[in-house]
């Protein structure tokens, strides 16, 4: 760490018990005491890293004199204390770092300089896929398959953990990165050789903001930005606007943390908080348990803010003690926060904010969200009605004719294979005439009778719940909703209720602690009675690793075009994300996952319809089995303790026997295997010189894709399974990979050849240039014929034709995945023109040398009459060669008729630092050149 110039004489001593720490006191700078908590953290960061060049006294004064009403205009350099990664985004980071070592050597530099300067930690959580479920064998089987598929990736990561200093890997099977972070990795306050400072952390996953619940300032970034931060490059940002979100009242009985966070998500997305900090304050904060705060922080990317932070208070240190942090660490956090004015005092004057919102927690009611966006909140009491309103958008709208018999699937070949019970087939799930078409009058219906391999039959229909998954760090980190799920399962099982036989039931907690307290509370037997067996420790359903549905169910859905649904306790429900067989996805609490598994359909009113009958034939309603707040709290008190966390995290980096026995390559540089379909040397530095080439205007570009609103990074670079016949599958076929070994696109992010072919390949992508969903476009080198996007890009590249993408609002929402920008770059796209961008993806595009542009205010591709067949010329980019970032560039779109549409597009290069990245062809090239010149 570079020694601070300490212009304000802020370095002081803090006594905590019998230990002394140095720290940079905010009280040394007038004005800092009035700032919101989040800006105090930024202020300390600048004080501590002041070098007189990139970070000066003027920057420190600028934040101390922050004007809440001003629009962001002052650039600062933020230096995070650490970097957090998961394996899907982390593998390409390590690939890039390994490639950079070779590039530095080639350009005459010292390859040993390519090393993380601050702690960088990775948790392997994105690779486990739920192939097996509904059995005690499910966990072992899924782990076995995970290692078989990912051995090469895991060997590479083990090499990285030895080859790079300051880089540690939490092995697979431990939990989900954000849950492991808040339960173990997060420091809250760092002790770096006697220097105390706030724990700040950026991560290669957008839900890194879960740590905001602990008072840790941080957010998700693309992998390329994380790599730069690891190598000492500060994060360039503007001092943001801060939205103060006042919480009052208390959460009422029967309302879960999930209900609260969905309400907040709806409010903030409607308000508009992109590029802003959100900070929670008010008397209601003290009543919110830390786990609930973490759940709220986790959803920050879903409402679009940079962070969603809670200050440090008594609840913070209480949670740190519970989760096994040392008494010395807990004492430091409390003393430091109080010394810096970062401790939440209930009677302290409120900070001034840029904008204000308020929520009385007592007004929150049970809710779900869907069918395709987290902000689309639905009152539980209106869920059936809303489902029926949305259904016509997903299936043909013929009226129901209940006199017609249900179709019957041919059961030939539906024979149970040896060991198939681990995939969810067991006698209790055989089917005994249950029907998802019951009560279908008034909605679209297409009943299909399916025979179970175990005997019996059942009827599927639109709205059937195909997947019910207790998943994701968002909720599995929260004991109240997880214990609640176990208790509702206990009550349901006692009354003889079961999940419907067509529901794939999954329980995949975010840490082993959940398994521990379920065992202590003896809840597993109750969950298992409803089909919810332990399936894995990882992200699973939430990122699309739901695994295949049973063959006969998948066939019935696809052959009859049924609109299947999924319910999950996750944070994202974007189209095509959860399963290729599922069209409508709903976010619900873990408790409601159980309820919907029993109901078996989204076409269900929990107030008026019984879930079933008990052994005496009495109707059982949701209210009859809903656990009380007292029951949940009593169970938590008896099942959860500090010792549980201490035992599970005693040696978090060690891993199981399989991990320890993996053969691991040696050496400072990696020995690339050109035949590998998982790990390939990155192409970003090929042909790179020490002097960057001048940037140039874009001439004669064609439109690769014309897209609508809310295009997600899932649409751009899906992480899901690889569909046979697509360019990515063709590449794997050509390289001898069997279809059942395709794995997922996310698992192959270390191979750019696969990822290029998977870019814009989401099965639900709606490219308005063509009339079919998926990764298709029109190839204007072939007279505009329909083609796979990758194939068309190869033809454009051969012809020397640059490409542009045009889109609507909220382009790039969702995951932080930098492959959405990397793939865009490698396909030959030079500019993306939209109505608005989501924060992380805009930054990632610049980091990969793609210029983000916005249509003039109030304009869109539709209002300008652009249909995507035009040829685009973009003038004014070359001003960047003169050290000037133009406010706008001139765009001329020439139609096939010769008519022209002209407009001035807003350049979304927002900071001088971003301009430097773009001039260098990307952030990694910029960092590499600076590293060699240092």
UniProtKB/Swiss-Prot annotation:
Q: Which GO terms describe its biological process?
A: propionate metabolic process, methylcitrate cycle; tricarboxylic acid cycle
Protein family: Belongs to the aconitase/IPM isomerase family.
**Entry EC no(s):** 4.2.1.3, 4.2.1.99
In which residue ranges is the amino acid composition biased (Basic and acidic residues)?
404-420
Q: Which reactions is this enzyme annotated as catalysing?
A: citrate = D-threo-isocitrate; (2S,3R)-3-hydroxybutane-1,2,3-tricarboxylate = 2-methyl-cis-aconitate + H2O
- Region Disordered: which residues? 398-454
Q: Where is the composition biased (Low complexity)?
A: 427-445
> Binding positions for [4Fe-4S] cluster?
473, 539, 542
Question: Where does this protein act, in terms of pathway?
Answer: Carbohydrate metabolism; tricarboxylic acid cycle; isocitrate from oxaloacetate: step 2/2; Organic acid metabolism; propanoate degradation
Q: What name is this protein filed under?
A: Aconitate hydratase A
> Per its record, what are the GO molecular function terms?
2-methylisocitrate dehydratase activity; 4 iron, 4 sulfur cluster binding; aconitate hydratase activity; metal ion binding; mRNA 3'-UTR binding; mRNA binding
Q: Which NCBIfam families match?
A: aconitase_1, PRK09277.1, PRK12881.1
Q: Which gene encodes it?
A: acn
Q: What does this protein do?
A: Involved in the catabolism of short chain fatty acids (SCFA) via the tricarboxylic acid (TCA)(acetyl degradation route) and probably via the 2-methylcitrate cycle I (propionate degradation route). Catalyzes the reversible isomerization of citrate to isocitrate via cis-aconitate. Could catalyze the hydration of 2-methyl-cis-aconitate to yield (2R,3S)-2-methylisocitrate. The apo form of AcnA functions as a RNA-binding regulatory protein.
Read off the PANTHER family from this record.
Answer: ACONITASE/IRON-RESPONSIVE ELEMENT FAMILY MEMBER
InterPro entries, per the entry: AcnA_IRP_Swivel, Acnase/IPM_dHydase_lsu_aba_1/3, Acoase/IPM_deHydtase_lsu_aba, Aconitase/3IPM_dehydase_swvl, Aconitase/IRP2, Aconitase_4Fe-4S_BS, Aconitase_4Fe-4S_dom, AconitaseA/IPMdHydase_ssu_swvl
Instruction: Tell me the cofactors it needs.
Output: [4Fe-4S] cluster
Keywords, ordered alphabetically: Iron, Iron-sulfur, Lyase, Metal-binding, RNA-binding, Tricarboxylic acid cycle
Q: How is the cofactor bound?
A: Binds 1 [4Fe-4S] cluster per subunit.
Q: How does it assemble?
A: Monomer.
């Amino acid at each position: 760490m570079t020694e601070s110039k300490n212009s304000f004489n802020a370095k002081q001593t803090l006594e905590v018990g019998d230990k002394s720490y140095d720290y940079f006191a905010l009280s040394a700078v007038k004005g800092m005491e009035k700032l919101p908590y989040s800006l105090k953290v930024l202020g300390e960061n600048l004080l501590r890293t002041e070098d007189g060049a990139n970070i000066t006294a003027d920057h420190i004064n600028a934040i101390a004199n922050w004007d809440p009403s001003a629009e962001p205009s002052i650039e600062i350099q933020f230096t995070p204390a650490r970097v957090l990664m998961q394996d899907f985004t982390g593998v390409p980071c390590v690939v890039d770092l390994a490639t950079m070592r070779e590039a530095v050597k080639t350009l005459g530099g010292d390859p040993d300089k390519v090393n993380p300067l601050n702690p960088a930690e990775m948790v392997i959580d994105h690779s486990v896929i739920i192939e097996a479920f509904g059995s005690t064998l499910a966990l072992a089987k899924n782990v076995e398959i995970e290692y078989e598929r990912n051995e090469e990736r895991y060997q590479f990561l083990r090499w990285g953990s030895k080859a790079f200093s300051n880089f540690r890997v939490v092995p697979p099977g431990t939990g989900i990165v954000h849950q492991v972070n808040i339960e173990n990795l997060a420091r809250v306050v760092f002790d770096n050789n006697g220097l105390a400072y706030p724990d700040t952390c950026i991560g290669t996953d957008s839900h890194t903001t879960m740590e905001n619940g602990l008072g840790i300032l941080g957010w998700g970034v693309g992998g390329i930005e994380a790599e730069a931060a690891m190598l000492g490059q500060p994060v360039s940002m503007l001092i943001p606007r801060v939205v103060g979100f006042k919480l009052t009242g208390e959460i009422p009985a029967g309302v879960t943390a999930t209900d609260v966070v969905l309400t907040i998500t709806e409010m903030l997305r409607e308000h508009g908080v992109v590029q802003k900090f959100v900070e929670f304050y008010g008397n209601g904060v003290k009543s919110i348990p830390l786990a609930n705060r973490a759940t709220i922080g986790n959803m920050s990317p879903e409402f679009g803010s940079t962070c969603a932070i809670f200050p440090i208070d008594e609840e913070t240190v209480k949670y740190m003690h519970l989760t096994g942090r040392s008494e010395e660490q807990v004492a430091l956090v409390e003393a430091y926060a109080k010394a810096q004015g970062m401790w939440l005092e209930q009677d302290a004057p409120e900070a001034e904010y840029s904008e204000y919102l308020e929520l009385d927690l007592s007004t929150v009611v049970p809710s779900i969200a869907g069918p395709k966006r987290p902000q689309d909140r639905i009152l539980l009491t209106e869920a059936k009605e809303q489902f029926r309103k949305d259904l016509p958008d997903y299936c043909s709208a013929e009226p129901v004719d209940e006199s017609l018999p249900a179709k019957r699937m041919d059961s030939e070949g539906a024979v149970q294979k040896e060991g198939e019970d681990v995939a969810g087939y067991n006698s209790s799930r055989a089917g005994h005439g249950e029907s998802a078409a019951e009560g279908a009058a008034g909605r679209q219906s297409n009943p299909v009778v399916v025979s179970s391999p175990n005997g019996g039959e059942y009827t599927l229909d639109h709205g059937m719940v195909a997947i019910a998954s207790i998943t994701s760090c968002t909720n599995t980190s929260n004991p109240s909703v997880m214990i609640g799920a176990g208790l509702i399962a206990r009550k349901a099982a006692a009354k003889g209720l079961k999940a419907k036989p067509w529901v794939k039931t999954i329980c995949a907690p975010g840490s082993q602690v959940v398994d521990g307290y379920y065992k202590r509370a003896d809840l597993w037997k109750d969950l298992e009675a409803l089909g919810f067996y332990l399936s894995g420790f990882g992200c699973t359903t939430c990122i699309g690793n739901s695994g295949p549905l049973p063959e006969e169910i998948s066939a019935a859905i696809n052959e009859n075009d049924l609109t299947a649904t999924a319910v999950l306790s996750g944070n994202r429900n974007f189209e095509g994300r959860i399963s290729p067989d599922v069209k409508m996805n709903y976010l619900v609490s873990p408790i409601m996952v159980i309820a919907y598994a029993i109901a078996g359909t989204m076409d269900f009113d929990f107030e008026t319809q019984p879930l079933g009958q008990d052994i005496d034939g009495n109707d059982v309603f949701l209210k009859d089995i809903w656990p009380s707040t007292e029951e949940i709290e009593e169970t938590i008190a008896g099942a959860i303790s500090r010792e549980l966390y201490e035992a599970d995290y005693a040696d978090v980096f060690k891993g199981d026997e399989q991990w320890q026995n993996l053969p691991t390559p040696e050496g400072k540089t990696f020995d690339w295997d050109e035949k590998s379909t998982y790990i390939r040397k990155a192409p970003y530095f090929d042909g790179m010189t020490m002097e960057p080439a001048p940037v140039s205007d874009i001439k004669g570009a064609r439109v690769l894709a014309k897209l609508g609103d809310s295009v997600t990074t899932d649409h751009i670079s899906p992480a899901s399974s690889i569909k046979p016949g697509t360019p990515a599958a063709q590449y794997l076929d050509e390289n001898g990979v069997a279809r059942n070994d395709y794995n997922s696109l996310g698992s192959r992010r270390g191979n750019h050849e696969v990822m290029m072919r998977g870019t814009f390949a989401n099965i639900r992508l709606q490219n308005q240039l063509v009339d079919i969903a998926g990764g298709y476009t029109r190839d204007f080198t072939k007279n505009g014929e329909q083609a796979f996007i990758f194939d068309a890009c190869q033809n454009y590249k051969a012809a020397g034709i640059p490409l542009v993408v045009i889109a609507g609002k909220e382009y790039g929402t969702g995951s932080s995945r930098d492959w959405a920008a990397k793939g865009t770059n490698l396909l030959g796209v030079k500019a993306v023109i939209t109505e608005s961008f989501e924060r992380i993806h805009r930054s990632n595009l610049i980091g990969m040398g793609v210029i983000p542009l916005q249509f003039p205010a109030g304009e869109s591709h539709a209002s300008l009459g652009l249909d995507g067949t035009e040829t685009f010329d973009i003038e004014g980019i070359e001003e960047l060669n003169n050290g000037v970032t133009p406010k706008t560039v001139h765009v001329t779109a020439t139609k096939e008729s010769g008519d022209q549409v002209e407009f001035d597009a807003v350049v979304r290069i927002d900071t001088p630092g971003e301009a430097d990245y773009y001039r260098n062809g990307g952030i990694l090239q910029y960092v590499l050149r600076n590293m060699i010149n240092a």
